[in-house]
């Protein structure tokens, strides 16, 4: 259930004010963009929603920086289309996040060739190492991972 969107966003705003660090939150529906933009610096589009035009456009129209996480089902080059939707809505503040590619049924891997491909679009690219080491939906129905590899992969 959680504490509620507005209360959570106010906590993020307080973190920004207190520590002077940029804050980010995921949005999952177009109607969440305006309220979230009142409280945080960066709106993040989750990987599974990175192709949702209405969500990308609503986020873009807030004027905030938009971080689009690459879906594990997309090629790095396909992220240009998601970025274009934000740009065409009048917002040039785009970041892209690489967070792994599906490898078989229960594994994600990083294809490092995708980073310069996405950088070629002219936007900052983030590597989300922890998500890229995920092992979704293991045989027990729980997502696992390989945290012991975080430091190695991050280098």
Set out the residue ranges of the language-model regions.
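Catalytic alpha/beta core domains of metabolic enzymes, predominantly
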Residues: 57-155
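Active-site loop-to-helix "anion-binding N-cap" substructures in soluble metabolic enzymes
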Residues: 10, 14, 33, 53-61
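A broad, low-specificity signal for short, low-complexity segments enriched in glycine/proline
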Residues: 4-7, 27-31, 87-89, 125-127
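A generic structural signal for short, solvent-exposed coil/turn residues
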Residues: 15-17, 88
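Aromatic/hydrophobic pocket-lining residues that form the small-molecule binding cavity
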Residues: 5-12, 52, 79, 146, ...
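Conserved structured catalytic cores and adjacent interaction surfaces
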Residues: 36
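Catalytic beta/alpha-barrel core
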Residues: 2-4, 19-29, 41-54, 65-76, ...
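Glycine-centered small-residue hotspots that permit tight backbone geometry or close packing
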Residues: 1-2, 104
């Amino acid at each position: 259930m959680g504490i509620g969107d507005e209360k959570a966003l106010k906590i993020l705003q307080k973190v920004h004010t207190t520590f002077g660090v940029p804050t980010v939150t995921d949005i999952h529906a177009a109607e969440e963009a305006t309220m979230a933009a009142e409280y945080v610096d960066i709106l993040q589009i989750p990987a599974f929603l990175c192709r949702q035009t209405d969500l990308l456009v609503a986020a873009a129209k807030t004027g905030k920086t938009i971080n689009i996480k690459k879906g594990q089902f997309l090629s790095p080059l396909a992220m240009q289309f998601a970025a274009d939707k934000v740009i065409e809505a009048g917002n040039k503040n785009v970041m892209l996040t690489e967070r792994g590619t599906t490898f078989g049924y229960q594994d994600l891997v990083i294809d490092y060739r995708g980073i310069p491909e996405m950088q070629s679009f002219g936007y900052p690219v983030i590597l989300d190492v922890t998500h890229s080491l995920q092992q979704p939906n293991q045989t027990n129905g729980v997502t696992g991972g390989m945290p012991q590899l975080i430091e190695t992969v991050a280098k």
